[in-house]
Amino acid sequence: MRAKLALTAAAVLAMAAQSGVAQTPAPKANIFPPWQHGANNDALNRGVEFTVPQIDDLADFHGDLTDPKLVLYVGGNYFFAMAPLVQAFEAAHPDYKGRIYWETIPPGLLVEQLKAGGRITSGNMTWTVKADAYLAGLRAVNGLIGQGLLTGAATPYVTNKLTIMVRAGNPKHITSLADLARPDVRLAMPNPEYEGVARQIKASLGKAGGDALDKAVYGSKVADGSAVLTRIHHRQTPLFLMQDVADAGVTWQSEAIFQEQVGNPITHVDIPDAQNTTAIYAGAEVAGAQHPQAARAWLEFIRSPEALSIFERYGFKPYAPGAAGGD
């Protein structure tokens, strides 16, 4: 019966195509954000639900803007961990339940938002929400403390490393960073202008193949169109792979693990430690924060055993003093 229905549906679609009747395209899979289907929204009252994946969504802006008691600017490469982290924080601090707002766009763009007084525009919407805490790479956090944008000491909490994200089954048989220079491999790579991870990637390319490999990936392949530069790699790279626009892209290991966990057709190729680059994640209170006590509570929580156990689900490692890295 199912086979007959499928054949009937196919016949109807074929007739519609021949007659010029428009059809709603059938999605290849549920590949478009928000990948956690609203779990990263902390609002207690969501009102009217209107989210159309690929068309109308704000996947990296979370919570209720009305009167938040804690505002977090979080580097986007652990957007997926924020829902369980916030849930655990609220269990320990119930006064904050439903009152936390956070953004997970690239850290460099979050710095621009800090400097703009918290004002940001996405599509046709402009709003202002000033951060209480900023969380990104340790080097960036220390730099912002030096500039006076952040205050107090940096709080390091976890480390992460790079991987090569590919489509499920690894159809191009990519085994190493050197393979990224192959002419038959299309790449999605973070843009150094917007995304700090590009610096770590370029360092790893240098370890794997010297300046020649770096120039091939970020020079020749960009110039000939076989590499596209992303502006928000934690969204674009997996999407470009699933849409068969790219064959590979270097990302943080945690991002690939998350894609595998949610069942998207993504896998990853490990990069040897000798060629890899480690990032140390840290946070600090924003100077002049409207909710300084809340910021300090979050920074204390983020390195707690409960928070670290959540991070470890996605391949992060707890920060150990003296660990190499810092980006």
Q: Residue ranges of each PLM-predicted region?
A:
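Helical hinge/lid and interdomain linker segments adjacent to catalytic or ligand-binding clefts
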Residues: 118-120
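Exported/periplasmic ABC-transporter solute-binding proteins
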Residues: 23-103, 108-115, 124-130, 138-139, ...
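Short beta-strand
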Residues: 155
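A short alpha->loop->secondary-structure connector
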Residues: 151-152
